[in-house]
UniProtKB/Swiss-Prot annotation:
Gene3D superfamilies: 3.40.50.360. SUPFAM superfamilies: Flavoproteins. The gene is azoR. This is FMN-dependent NADH:quinone oxidoreductase. It is an enzyme of class 1 (oxidoreductase). Belongs to the azoreductase type 1 family. It comes from Trichlorobacter lovleyi (strain ATCC BAA-1151 / DSM 17278 / SZ). The keyword Flavoprotein applies.
């Protein structure tokens, strides 16, 4: 049995969201093939994602000097605890599915906040004399990024979403990365149905291989 973490970052309801529609098709087909797997859901807009703020930095600084949690403020303990819980959940996961829209050539800020909570020294990567090393390497972990763009950006220098997420996953040691992207539906609305059908088919293929 594998643990799946299905991470969404979208304010729209599913029926109005292209990426969530494709993600739902993937989930349906994947669940049919792997009914024994456990799927956990994380909605980055509705679940509390703790940003790294002054309390977090101050608390981490105290812990690095050898201080115990008893010497941290209530806010520092609460915030660092939430970040630790998210990082532990990430480490314990076998397969990750990110579902995002493109916003201004990237993705919503909530996803960057989440990435900052799971890229943790000593948990997902470490530093060596030769550079940073991902601690999740060699564990067979996989990542799928389902993404939507109104224009045509995939593979261009303007795309700061899919390549960035792929780079971050590799940084932590997750080398098996694939993506399903629907794009151009706003640029060429008369072909929107065609583009969506293609992405849905790709999501079904991804479910068979994931």
């Amino acid at each position: 049995m594998a643990n799946i973490l299905y991470i969404t970052c979208n304010l729209k309801p599913r029926e109005q969201s292209r990426s969530l529609t494709i993600g739902n098709e993937f989930l349906k087909r994947y669940s049919e093939r792997h009914p024994e797997d456990r799927i956990d859901f994380l909605d980055l807009y509705r679940d509390p994602i703790q940003r790294i703020d002054t309390d977090v930095l101050n608390g981490w600084g105290k812990l690095r000097t050898g201080a115990s949690f008893d010497l941290l403020s209530e806010d520092e303990v609460r915030k660092i605890g939430r970040i630790g819980a998210l990082a532990d959940q990430f480490v314990a996961t076998d397969k990750y599915v990110f579902v995002t829209p493109m916003w201004n050539l990237g993705f919503p800020a909530e996803l960057k906040m989440y990435i900052d909570t799971v890229c943790v020294v000593g948990k997902t990567f470490t530093y060596t004399e030769s550079g940073a090393v991902g601690l999740l390497r060699g564990m067979g972990k996989k990542c799928l990024h389902i993404h939507s763009c109104g224009g045509f950006h995939c593979g261009s220098a303007d795309d700061h979403s899919v390549p960035y997420l792929k780079s971050v996953m590799n940084f932590m040691g997750i080398e098996d990365f694939r993506s399903v992207v629907v794009e151009g539906m706003d640029a060429l609305p008369h072909r929107a149905e065609e583009f969506m059908d293609k992405a849905l088919a790709e999501s079904r293929e991804a479910a068979a291989l994931f």
